[in-house]
Amino acid sequence: MKLHKKKLTLFAFFILTVLTVTLKTYFSYYVDFSLGVKGLVQNLILLMNPYSLIALVLSIFLFFKGKKAFWFIFIGGFILTFLLYANVVYFRFFSDFLTFSTLNQAGNVESMGGAVTASFKWYDFVYFIDTIIYLFVLIFKQKWLDKRVFSKKFVPVVMAASIALFFLNLAFAESDRPELLTRTFDHKYLVKYLGPYNFTVYDGVKTIQNNQQKALANEDDLTKVLNYTKQKQTEPNKEYFGAAKKKNIIKIHLESFQTFLINKKVNGEEVTPFLNKLSTGNEGYRYYPNFYHQTGQGKTSDSEFTMDNSLFGLPQGSAYSLKGDNTYQSLPAILDQQQGYTSSVMHGDYKTFWNRDQVYKHFGIDKFYDATYYDMSEDNIENLGLKDKEFFKESADYLAKEKQPFYNHLITLTNHYPFTVSPEDASIEKPNTGDSTVDGYIQTARYLDESLEEFVNELKKKGLYDDSVIMIYGDHYGISENHNKAMEKLLGEDITPAKFNDLNRTGFWLKIPGKEGTVDKTYAGQADVMPTILHLMGIDTKNYLMMGTDLLSKDHNDTVPFRNGDFVTKDYKYVNGRIYDNKNNEPMTEKPKDFEKRKQQSEKDLQMSDDVLNGDLLRFYDNPDFDKIKPSEYEYKTGPKGQERK
């Protein structure tokens, strides 16, 4: 018995392996992964999240007997270690985590051999020191092992405890980051809250689901959608068709902007004086006050997706995250193939957020200027990333060097929840609603307005303003229904369901060189932007699959569907199962004659778009006007040295 006490039991070896793999995971969190951990709750989650899957996987091998059990636990621990280390090396180079989608592109590693080698660090032995020790014991010191059968009645207890710990971890994660699994944020979020091993399981489940949906799809499904979208198409306005052919296109994303801010005064001051000027129709802009966002859970990523593809985001999660590997016929790619445009995106956040570094390759976007191209010193950072003024200042310099004609998309950040701005950047007093979110929103919106004005002035100085098509739009609402009481104080009116629907107007400003501005009260949404731009460029759209219609067309369809099933028209809105008159936002006593037709169309638009995404239907489409995008031809390098198409 004394001899047995000195030996290493199977359960002790199990505990040791769980602890060492967990410790290595902690080491990676703080040394190699940049997870942006803040506060007590997130640190507690970080301590918790590796254990559950490590213990659950390794506990399975406790059912085995003798030497086999030791070896299986060792192999299990080694596989987990290898997965961790593979993520470490991948993260050092790509600032992202391995997914099953990226493993399908493993052939690219051969061409990056030098870069992968450069990703090795001197301290990497830490990840394998326990593996070496365990291997030495298993081969040369078997006499140290107690090979007696482990009592299997304890194994279910260990497994149950592991599963319970996972759900506790998930509960903490959901409390700190609601809708974590359904909205599928940046992979860093998922790893921070779930750990690298649970993230791999999650990614595997999502991959299987996506593959199953794709596997069932066929060309007949595509034909149904094409037949539907072709009968939706409208004739272009002759006055505008080709009016901006081969003009530079600058698309400016106003983060979380809502049109109630236009002409709004707080303490006697205009919140957005510059945008107010652009909204008069006297500054060369067509202003669309009845332009709505059509995003779902993907929010910003959905707005990008919808405007560049004229498809809707998914009912759950982000299309960028879940359908990023699909085949697309995007606006920037069409402009490239039809008129030789180069395309770029500029954003003061890191390229992996919302899976942009992968999605943009499938959109055929040539260049991506992410945070690594900007001065990200502490003084220039606010909230999620680079301050808008610094972002626009540096972006203008990059833009001046772009090959023309170009299609450029600039994504701002400062006017983002929780709407904080440093005292030196706050140029308007907060209102006094008692809600820090609503009060802060006024200050960050003013800062955004000032930033935009400075950028426009820079464009004028660089000779890029007058002869460019300029689009300005709000991507999604900033103030949710949770802040209705404060909004009632700010606006001086009740926030009914109909009024909240009105607050989903995010605005669209369109400057067309050589054309006068106006206030256009047409009802429209983000899906309508792509066909509008293509017609302005003089591009025939009959062979492109799009859910929206040309804003400038006399036959524009003014039914605006929303991802939650609501919709709005120029006369009425359908919200939460009730119909409201747009004139007074009062419930309508009689159903409009065209209501059922509009409702069915709205539902079908969403369903057809979902079918395209879930079945990856565009892979079947041999469009005579479009060559399929080859994602492997695009690579987005880390700044500031620039990036070029291969």
UniProtKB/Swiss-Prot annotation:
Statement: the UniProt record of this protein carries the keyword Magnesium: no
Residue ranges, annotated region (Disordered): 579-646
Record-marked site positions (Cleavage): 217-218
Binding-site positions, substrate: 416
Sequence similarity: Belongs to the LTA synthase family.
Keywords assigned: Cell membrane, Cell wall biogenesis/degradation, Manganese, Membrane, Metal-binding, Secreted, Transferase, Transmembrane, Transmembrane helix
Subcellular location: Cell membrane
BP-aspect Gene Ontology terms: cell wall organization; lipoteichoic acid biosynthetic process
GO molecular function terms attached to this record: metal ion binding; transferase activity
Pathway: Cell wall biogenesis; lipoteichoic acid biosynthesis
Post-translational modification: Proteolytically cleaved.
Coiled coil start-end: none
Name under which the protein is recorded: Lipoteichoic acid synthase
Biased composition (Basic and acidic residues): 580-607, 625-646
Residues spanning the signal sequence: none
EC number: 2.7.8.-
Residues reported to bind Mn(2+): 255, 300, 475-476
Extracellular membrane side: 29-43, 90-119, 175-646
Topological domains annotated Cytoplasmic: 1-7, 65-68, 141-153
Gene that specifies this protein: ltaS
